[in-house]
Amino acid sequence: AIGVCALFAATVIGAQPSSRPRPYKVVFDLTTDDPKDQAAVLNYIREIRSVNPDTDIEVLMYGRGTSMVVTGRSTLADDVNHALGRGHLSFRVCEIAIRNQKIDKSQLLPNVTTVPDGIGEIVAKQKEGWGDIKVVAH
């Protein structure tokens, strides 16, 4: 999470105060089940939106990161649902991860979608020019 803070600060500091930042596209690569790290991602999203509301953001979860969007397991369900209601944001889960964890798609929070392969999704996003921010447990 510290690395994300440094990158976010550099992005914000690099913007000229009098200019409107150009929208960009970023994917948060989340594999941790630590509620503090998951909450930090939501905070980064709020801060990015406060500076640049047109930025496209995707939170991609695989491994233990899936807990953020599983009904009955997520401690942040209300925050995720609120964030999704503002647009320019998607929460996506790796189908391999949920299959390995025996999670059915029906257990995911509303409006959370799946991708066949989380790592493949990240690679595809990078090819499309998306920034990739790896969120690591601390």
What is each PLM-predicted segment?
Residues 2-10:
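Bacterial N-terminal signal peptides
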Residues 13-138:
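Secreted/extracellular ectodomain signature
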